[in-house]
């Protein structure tokens, strides 16, 4: 990568052409000598007329030409009367508009800012400024000055301007004092710096911080890392090795630090089968409250009723179907007990059973709500039931606090307006979302949960579906009979063979499951691209963007998503003068690209056919419809929702011609292409292969190594995931 020469430039702001108040990204014109310079980067709030000294480097933009990329921004207040007027007229101080700015500067000239700060009573000499307004003007000016002083102080600690903005938003005017005393506070909730970054900032401080802060932050960092790997808790003894390595200390010190964190309530301890486990408090609360809510439903079940055989017979006749014994059992359980987990693999009739339950609920006059974890899963649920379905977030009427944490309007104090709720794709739901969902259920509400326990666990923390089934306390019906029509599909047959640990049939032709063998990762990647771009569209009329999805076990390697996305972008959406593009890191985003959101962003606004809303979530797939280089905004269609985002939000996207199996969960696609070659051992599990295979509705093509496909089908090991929901469901109530 080319290394740019770092330089410093200074000048007066002529105009701020773009500024994002959320993250500080700014584009401005700077008068530096006789030159008008475009400067871009993360900067604090700025106004025309301010004097800046910028550190950074020159860069060349394909559309806008030469720009100065800002890494550090220092600024001074304007000194000349002309610059002061421009600053005030641009809204530099709250309460002063352009006309009032002229009056003030005409009267006080170069002394204007000094008077605003130190002698604001004199402002009341000007018509239109009352003594009270003069005080407000001065207070706002001083607040801005304080903010800038804080930014300067923080930059001395090696923090970038973007980091300073984040710290100030979290800590306010006390930011510099807090960080000087305890830089590891930056790792806390609402700030989110990595432990390693806090270590570097700590090294820049004039005095080393208390080592206790560092030890506690390090232990919490290890706990958070476990959380990101899906664990809700961790055995205490498992903490010693990573903590001693990270902190370069001994086990006794780690042990003492853990006790301190437990004593202060920042960790929670619970013994499970005579083994001590550690939890972060909010996860402990989520698992325990979920178990308590489920036990409450079991103790005081919804008012069920006897389900007569003739009612089920009537549904069969109405829909022209015949239920199997297990399907009838599931319907009876849902009606009579009001609580059910319905599970089973593809082709076992989960959807048919679900529709029968739904029709009987409605026949009883119940108001039924349908929900799923993702937008695509909710859309599919709506299609197969013929009724509206929402994401769990929308069902709970989510709002977001200043730290981007979900706050649900529907909760125990304001429960859902429903008498029955059906929740699909339960295997994808993590424990924190499940806890919020259960909290919002009204007393007496019937609950049917649907999922496939053989799929991968959720990306987030917890193992909700598995733990509830394993507890044995929740009514479960597992559909095992594969219906004849479904068995005509080799996708369905092979999915069930994989679940049983049997090798899938790979040599059958003229079906819906195909295998193209190669032992070369390079050839496999090229084959995948050709299948998506040419062969499947030609044979079946599929759209490469809308109907075909490449699903990879891993990101890395020749057949990982990173490389295949580059290959397929070059094939399906090559550079063209009519397609504006921009580069973020190593990724080119071009008009027409298929993209995916990689983290929850609760602030993105969107419009759709059913109304407007906010929030685009991790795993949402869309098409980049327009890249506007002038406004630095991008338009993306996520299914039927149109979102317009600033360029800086593109860093939360990645190309989605190929996605990982984990990211594909909850989605189904008409055609799936899956390269299986060189899969890392940590991912070469049966449930990963099974989850990928069951994403395909009509056509599946596996490309790669026959021996690896067979070995994955035989490998029933699963990545160990520590969770406690089963324990809390089984533990005696106090």
Name the predicted role of every residue range.
Residues 1-310, 733:
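Accessory, non-ATPase domains that flank or precede helicase/AAA+ motor cores in DNA-metabolism machines
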Residues 453-614:
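Conserved helicase motor core of P-loop NTPases
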Residues 233, 328-331, 336-509:
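ASCE P-loop NTPase helicase motor core
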Residues 49-51, 592, 619:
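Loop/turn positions that initiate beta-strands
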Residues 500, 609, 618-734:
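C-terminal accessory regions
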């Amino acid at each position: 990568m080319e290394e740019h020469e770092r330089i410093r430039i200074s000048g007066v702001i002529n105009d701020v052409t773009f500024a994002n108040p959320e993250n500080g990204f700014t584009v401005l014109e700077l008068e530096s000598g006789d030159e008008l310079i475009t400067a871009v980067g993360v900067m604090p709030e700025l106004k025309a007329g301010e004097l800046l000294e910028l550190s950074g480097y020159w860069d060349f933009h394909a559309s806008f030409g030469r720009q100065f990329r800002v890494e550090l921004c220092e600024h001074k207040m304007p000194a000349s009367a002309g610059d002061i007027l421009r600053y005030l007229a641009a809204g530099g101080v709250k309460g002063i508009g352009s006309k009032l700015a002229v009056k003030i500067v005409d009267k006080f000239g170069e002394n204007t800012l000094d008077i605003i700060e130190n002698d604001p009573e004199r402002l009341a000499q000007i018509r239109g400024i009352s003594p009270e307004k003069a005080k407000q003007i001065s207070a706002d000016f001083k607040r801005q000055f304080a903010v800038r002083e804080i930014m300067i102080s923080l930059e001395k600690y090696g923090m970038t301007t973007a980091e300073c903005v984040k710290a100030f938003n979290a800590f306010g005017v006390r930011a510099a004092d807090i960080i000087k005393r305890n830089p590891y506070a930056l790792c806390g909730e609402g700030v989110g710096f990595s432990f390693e970054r806090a270590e570097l900032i700590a090294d820049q401080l004039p005095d080393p911080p208390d080592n206790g802060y560092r030890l506690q932050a390090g232990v919490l960092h290890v706990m958070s890392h476990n959380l990101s790997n899906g664990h809700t808790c961790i055995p205490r003894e498992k903490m010693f090795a990573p903590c001693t390595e990270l902190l370069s200390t001994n086990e006794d010190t780690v042990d003492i630090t853990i006790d301190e964190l437990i004593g202060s309530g920042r960790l929670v301890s619970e013994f499970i089968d005579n083994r001590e486990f550690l939890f972060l408090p909010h996860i402990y609360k989520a698992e325990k409250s979920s178990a308590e809510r489920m036990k409450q439903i079991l103790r005081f079940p919804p008012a069920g009723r006897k389900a007569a055989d003739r009612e089920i017979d009537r549904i069969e006749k109405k829909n022209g179907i015949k239920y199997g014994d297990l399907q009838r059992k599931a319907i009876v359980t849902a009606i009579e007990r009001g609580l059910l987990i319905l599970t089973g693999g593809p082709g076992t009739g989960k959807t048919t059973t679900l529709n029968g339950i739904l029709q009987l609920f409605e026949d009883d006059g119940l108001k039924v709500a349908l929900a799923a974890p993702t937008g695509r899963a909710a859309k599919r649920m709506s299609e197969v039931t013929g009724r509206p379905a929402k994401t769990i977030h929308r069902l709970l009427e989510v709002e977001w606090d200043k730290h981007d944490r979900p706050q649900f309007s529907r909760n125990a104090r304001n429960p859902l307006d429903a008498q029955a709720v059906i929740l699909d794709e339960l295997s994808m739901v993590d424990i924190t979302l499940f806890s919020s969902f259960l909290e919002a259920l009204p007393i007496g509400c019937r609950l049917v949960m649907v999922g496939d326990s053989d799929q991968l666990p959720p990306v987030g923390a917890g193992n909700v579906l598995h733990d509830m089934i394993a507890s044995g306390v929740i009514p479960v019906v597992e559909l095992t009979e594969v219906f004849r029509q479904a068995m005509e599909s080799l996708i369905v047959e092979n999915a069930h063979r994989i679940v049983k640990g049997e090798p899938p049939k790979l040599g059958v032709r003229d079906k819906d499951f195909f295998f193209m063998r190669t032992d070369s990762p390079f050839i496999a990647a090229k084959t995948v691209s050709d299948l998506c771009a040419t062969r499947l569209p030609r044979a079946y009329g599929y759209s490469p963007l809308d109907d075909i999805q490449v699903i990879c076990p891993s990101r890395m390697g020749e057949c990982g998503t990173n490389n295949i996305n580059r290959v397929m972008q070059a094939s399906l959406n090559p550079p063209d003068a009519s397609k504006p593009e921009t580069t973020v890191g190593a990724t080119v985003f071009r008009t027409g690209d298929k993209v995916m959101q990689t983290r929850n962003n609760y602030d993105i606004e969107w419009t759709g056919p059913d109304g407007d809303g906010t929030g685009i979530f991790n795993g949402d797939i869309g098409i980049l419809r327009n890249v506007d280089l002038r406004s630095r905004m991008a338009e993306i269609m996520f299914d039927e929702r149109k979102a317009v985002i600033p360029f800086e939000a593109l860093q939360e996207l990645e190309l989605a011609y190929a996605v990982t199996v984990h990211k594909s969960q909850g989605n189904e696609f008409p055609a799936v292409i899956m390269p299986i070659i060189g899969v890392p051992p940590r991912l070469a599990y049966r449930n990963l292969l099974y989850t990928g295979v069951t994403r395909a509705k009509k056509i599946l093509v596996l490309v790669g190594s026959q021996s690896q496909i067979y070995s994955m089908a035989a490998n029933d090991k699963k990545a160990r995931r520590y969770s406690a929901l089963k324990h809390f469901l089984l533990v005696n109530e106090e």
